[in-house]
Regions:
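N-terminal "cap/leader" segments of large eukaryotic alpha-helical scaffolds
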Residues: 1-85, 90-93
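Structural recognition of alpha-solenoid helical scaffolds
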Residues: 55-58, 98-102, 139-140, 173, ...
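Buried hydrophobic core positions in alpha-solenoid tandem helical repeats
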Residues: 59-60, 102-104, 143-146, 186-188, ...
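Alpha-helical solenoid repeats of the armadillo/HEAT superfamily
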Residues: 68-80, 111-124, 134-138, 152-166, ...
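Recurring C-terminal helix/loop segment of individual leucine-rich repeat
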Residues: 92, 133, 146, 173-176, ...
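Eukaryotic helix-linker segments that join adjacent hydrophobic helices
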Residues: 94-146
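Hydrophobic, ordered structural segments
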Residues: 143, 165-168
Length: 335
């Protein structure tokens, strides 16, 4: 992943919160009575102490109890969720305590709030790299995909998308497993129909998945990702132009992605971005056009008809960026 893309996709849908101390996707919109808030505060203080495994173990035991009521499951999952949100050391202890498997089991619970607390607790745990492997080994991927598809609340679905993003960052095998489990069509749907937060989360997750496993690019194209990406690129008010452009560039690395982009009218969108976009947008649009033109005379003719030759000629200028100079060498036919 190049440095521009790393910066652009470094978050999971949050522009105003530090992911080391807060949930990186949907905000924690819970409200508590004074008594409940005081209890949570005592829990956080006790778990921050040196010998803090006792409270965590009690919460895990509560989740695992076959006699646990819905209320007790809500409370235990919520407290683990908040501890993982606020306490970096607590994330490691929770992951090592055996909490992941019972939290995963909550994703199929009938109660929407139990499910949401479970999803968000897993999301907060996944901030810690050590917990990613634990979650994958615990079989969290498929339940998270099911939550992304059918969780009762939008927050749970968006947080499931973010958790899948975190797991896909573990390695290429995990990224392929997330794609194989059926996450990509659901993320494309979230990209099309979600709110502003959901769209950003979906784009970030898709970019990571498509960068981490080549087969995921084909899955994204087959799921219809190109059309909503072009729509977002054409809408400055979306706040998604850069993210969508970088994700599209990832997809046009495949023949299927290039074909879908041309079929959906993407050449004109890219040419317009070259003409009126920011410097970063111009650069990624030119790189995508060059990728589309590579070894395809028909596409080169279409690009020329859209008026893209002048900006491509600019590749030969001394002030061209290093990336574009590299592509100039690769696609020297445009000199």
């Amino acid at each position: 992943m190049d440095s521009d893309a790393s910066e652009l996709f470094s978050d999971c849908g949050s522009d105003d919160r530090d992911s080391s101390t807060s949930e990186p996707c949907s905000s924690d919109d819970l409200s508590f009575t004074p008594a409940a808030a005081a209890g949570i505060h005592r829990l956080l203080l006790s778990c921050a102490a040196e010998a803090s495994d006792g409270p965590i173990s009690s919460l895990v035991a509560e989740l695992e109890s076959p006699k646990a009521s819905v209320g007790s499951l809500r409370r235990a999952a919520m407290e683990l969720r908040l501890l993982a949100k606020h306490n970096p050391d607590g994330r490691i202890r929770i992951g090592a305590s055996g909490a992941v498997r019972p939290l995963v089991s909550l994703l199929s619970h009938a109660d929407p709030l139990v499910q949401e607390h479970g999803v968000t607790a897993l999301l907060n745990l996944s901030i810690c790299d050590e917990n990613k492997a634990i979650m994958v080994e615990a079989g969290a991927i498929r339940p998270l995909v099911r939550a992304l598809k059918s969780a009762a609340s939008p927050a749970a679905r968006e947080n499931a998308a973010c958790a899948l993003l975190r797991l896909s960052q573990l390695d290429s095998t995990a990224a392929a497993a997330v794609g194989h489990a059926g996450a990509i069509p659901l993320l494309v749907s979230l990209l099309e129909t979600g709110g502003a937060r959901g769209k950003k989360d979906a784009a970030t997750a898709l970019y990571t998945l498509c960068s981490g496993a080549r087969e995921n690019r084909l899955r994204a194209v087959e799921a219809g990702a190109v059309r909503p990406l072009l729509d977002l690129m054409s809408d400055p008010e979306s706040g998604m132009v850069d993210k969508a452009a970088y994700l599209l560039h990832s997809l046009v690395g495949s023949a299927e992605g290039r074909s879908a982009t041309v079929k959906e009218g993407g050449i004109s969108v890219l040419v317009e971005m070259v003409e009126v976009g920011t410097s970063r947008q111009k650069e990624i649009a030119i790189l995508s056009l060059l990728q589309i033109c590579d070894d395809n005379a028909v596409y080169r003719t279409m690009v020329a008809r859209e008026g893209a030759i002048p900006p491509l000629v600019a590749l030969s200028q001394p002030n061209a960026s290093p990336k574009l100079k590299t592509k100039k060498y690769t696609y020297g036919r445009y000199d």
